[in-house]
Amino acid sequence: VFVSVPRVYEKVLARVQASLRSSALVREIERTRDDLDRSHRLLSAKQAELESELQSAADFVRAQLPLPGMPAPGVSMQWAYQPSLALGGDLFQVSAWGSETLGLYILDASGHGVAAALRAVALMSFLREDNLAKAVGSFDPGAIITEANRRFPLTQDGEYFTLWVGRLHLPSRTLSYAAAGHSGAFLHSLQGDSQWL
């Protein structure tokens, strides 16, 4: 039997090289798996942080809403607030605008999520009593909507607000209101009559 040494040497060398490549590939796969595990842990931690921040923002927006009950003698208010996401651009408020007037508004910033909520809170800040006195000079619903439209126009990205503003004069029980794209509010009288405004 004749055995060629160079041939055996080439086979052994090829097997050793294949084994080394396999070992290197195994080490590379293990490193990649470790990197993926580390990335997954980081992403999970970041997701938990973002969800916590989103919940905190949703809690802040909810805290801006009025409390159910009687904002003024003889005026009862009930509401349910259920945004489609944890956070959205729908807000409303009832607050004193002077000693004899209640201001009411319902607003909706287009879109959903954080961006819509931030735009809604910006408009809500504009609608505060002290700001309206300076910016508009009155609590007239039409004038308020006109100024809101000037300050918060339709953007190039298509972002917009719909808004309903009401003013209830308490001594006379007179409600005046204006709407800009919003369907309005629901009024229920003591006599049991209900109507959309």
Model-derived regions, located:
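Two-component signal transduction core modules
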Residues: F2-V3
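The C-terminal output helix
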Residues: Q17-D34
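… and, occasionally, acidic/histidine-rich disordered N-termini of signaling adaptors
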Residues: R38-L197
